[in-house]
Amino acid sequence: MKLLQTPLYQECKELGGKMVPFANWEMPVSFSGLIEEHNAVRKNVGMFDISHMGVVQLKGKNIKSALQNLVPSDVFRIGPSEACYTVFLKENGGIQDDLIIYDQGVLDTNEESIVLVINAARKESDIEWLSSNLFKKEITISEFMPEGALIAIQGPESISTLEKILEEPLSNLPRFGHRTITSNPNLINSQESIFIARTGYTGEEGFEFLSSPETAKSIWKSLIASGVTPCGLGARDTLRLEASMHLYGNDINLDTTPFEAGLGWLVHLEMPNDFIGRKALEKQAEVGTQKKLVGIQVLDKGIARKGYPVLYNSETVGIVTSGTWSPTLQKPIALAYVPSEIAKVNTQIEVEIRRKKHPAIIVKRPFYRKGF
């Protein structure tokens, strides 16, 4: 199957992006190098082409009431121009996807609008699942700016950098706040809408914005001219792992529940509403979980990768879900599921790396978090 290309594919190639397959897309894994890109985001500012992500719009009446039956989080706690992180669940409490819900309020057409940003690999199944659960409602499901480009700009200098280019005040936009702005006429001939949110996947201050390809290309080039470092999937992974942010397919999946994954704060059982997976989660909240996701630090130079066994008292008890060398902390870190009874900080364990046992310890998560 031919891989899909984002609207910024050529721009990435021209900057030396090393392209790899990812969730049916051809995406840059790196530009100047993972360490340099990672450090740019931690210390200055970097940007990512994340146009492969799914962006879905729900329009109609009583959308929140319908959506409340599909997620375990209280969606009524957010209002227009606000957003929240949550998950879609199966009846057994397993996680179908993690996502961000953006409340756009009421449109000029008197319709309510909710925008969902979902994972690229889960886009088709999520849309099918939404359609099957909302088909009796007066709600339409469509891609939001289907031809658009999505860019993330992340790092301590992201606010000042983006404010200069967009000529738009952004420091007053709260965390998980969002709004639609009009593009700076100096960037593109015609003024166009840009959907911008103060969100990210790095543990740093940052923004994500969606616009037409033409506007995105103009902003991308202006960011490069301003000295912003282009970053690939490799740095995005090390950054999110340091911040203990979950990667779907690795750290969460259909066989893991929010309580097991350390996402219990997303589950609002105090709500009277029923939602898919509620019964399973109520039972788990009552009796506890058999496994938990923990942070691990390998105590030598061994790097634990996805699928490596975790041992306790020489017995295999778990599996690594994500692992890397942390450029910020200068040590190997990983996430893994282990039995709940040993999921305690300072528990001594081992990780089997290429048939050799390496000493490790369970540590507090996140490994690092400065901004978001």
Curated annotation (Swiss-Prot):
InterPro entries: GCS_T, GCS_T_bac, GCST_C, GCV_T_N, GcvT/YgfZ/DmdA, GcvT/YgfZ_C, TrmE/GcvT_dom1. Its EC number is 2.1.2.10. The keyword Ubl conjugation does not apply. It catalyses: N(6)-[(R)-S(8)-aminomethyldihydrolipoyl]-L-lysyl-[protein] + (6S)-5,6,7,8-tetrahydrofolate = N(6)-[(R)-dihydrolipoyl]-L-lysyl-[protein] + (6R)-5,10-methylene-5,6,7,8-tetrahydrofolate + NH4(+). Keywords: Aminotransferase, Transferase. Signal peptide: none annotated. GO terms for biological process: glycine decarboxylation via glycine cleavage system. GO terms for cellular component: cytosol; glycine cleavage complex. GO terms for molecular function: aminomethyltransferase activity; transaminase activity. It is an enzyme of class 2 (transferase). The glycine cleavage system catalyzes the degradation of glycine. PANTHER family: AMINOMETHYLTRANSFERASE, AMINOMETHYLTRANSFERASE, MITOCHONDRIAL. The glycine cleavage system is composed of four proteins: P, T, L and H. HAMAP family: GcvT (MF_00259). Belongs to the GcvT family. This is Aminomethyltransferase. The lineage of its organism: Bacteria, Bacillati, Cyanobacteriota, Cyanophyceae, Synechococcales.
